[in-house]
Amino acid sequence: MKTVVSMGVHILDVLGRHVSEIPPGQNIALIDEIRITAAGTAAGTSVDMAKLGCKVVAVGAAGDDEMGNVLLGIMNRYGIDTSHMKRKKGVQTSGTMLPIRPNGERPALHVMGTNATFCFEDVPQDVVKNADFVHIGGFYLMPKFDGEDTVKTLKVAR
């Protein structure tokens, strides 16, 4: 089986459906569903590839917090190798709250968190070098990795 390294933006999404309005003050609104997912252009892609039967190795960053535990737990349940995810002490795992509207619109409230800290030093070069395929997702959402760090990583992947 071919190995795919899926590297980049890993986000824990909290989705609420259907949200017509945010109640004022301390009021409550009842909705149909709340769920959490592994999301972002690396984590979400990893889950999809794992569902298709690929051997997936996740490379990115997550906090040493409960959100990071939940995110990696979801990915592990799909058989994704998360052993190369860097746990960043004292930095919140990247997360998004999505109040999904009845018409399907998805405004987002986002914390960049650990994705803002991901850099070339976090990349397991031997894993990238030996992968059959490398997917990098999340340009412009990883300020330390964008640019030169991405170029260095792609040179390793050759």
Where are the regions that the model predicts?
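Glycine-rich phosphate/adenosyl-contacting loop at the front of the ribokinase-like
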Residues: 1-61, 66-77
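Ribokinase/PfkB-type carbohydrate-kinase core domain
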Residues: 1-11, 73-87, 100-158
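Generic hydrophobic-segment detector
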Residues: 15, 29-36, 94, 103, ...
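Beta-strand->loop->alpha-helix junctions that form or flank phosphate-binding loops
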Residues: 59-64, 83-92
